[in-house]
Amino acid sequence: MDQPSVTFYRWDDMPKERVSEVLDRRLITGDRVMLTHVYIKRGGIVPRHSHANEQITYILEGGLRFWIGHDESEVIDVRAGEVLHIPSFVEHKAEALEDTVDVDIFSPPRQDWLDKTDDYLREK
C-alpha cells in the first residue's frame, strides 16, 4: 500500500476569495479537515447558521462577537489569541468588532464553501 504524500502550502500563495463586500477567505482542504483564513471588515456580520461540521475559530487579529443558540441568548467576545470551539449543529452568528483575521478549522470540510453554495454568507 502506498503511503499518502504530504502537501506544503504558503498562505500568500493561496487564492483569496471575495465572498462579500465585508468577507474574504483562503482555504486549504484535506480529506477530513479544512483550514481557512477568514478576513472580515469591522461591522461585518456572519448571519445565524449551523452546520454538521465541527468548528474551531482562532482569532489572529481583531475580534468577533458570537451569539450562540437559536435565541442568541449566549454572547461571547473572542479576541486575538483566543479560541472558540463550536460543536456540530450549534446555531451561531458573528460580528467583527474590528477588522479581523481568523483561522477557522472545520471537520469534515465545508462542502458548501468548496461549492460556493454558502448563500447565507454571500447575501451580505
Predicted features by range, described:
Residues 1-32, 36, 119-124:
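A short, N-terminal "cap"/entry segment at the start of jelly-roll beta-barrel domains
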Residues 32-33, 53, 61, 99, ...:
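ATP/adenylate-binding site constellation spanning eukaryotic-like Ser/Thr protein kinases
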Residues 36-50:
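Conserved short histidine dyad/triad with adjacent acidic residue
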Residues 41, 78-91, 95:
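Conserved metal-binding segment of the jelly-roll/cupin
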Residues 51-53, 83:
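Amphipathic, hydrophobic secondary-structure cores in small proteins
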Residues 56-80, 90:
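A short beta-strand-loop-beta hairpin characteristic of the jelly-roll/cupin
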Residues 67, 79-84, 111, 119:
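A beta-strand edge to alpha-helix "cap/lid" segment located at domain peripheries
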Residues 88-112:
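Ligand-binding loop in jelly-roll beta-barrel domains
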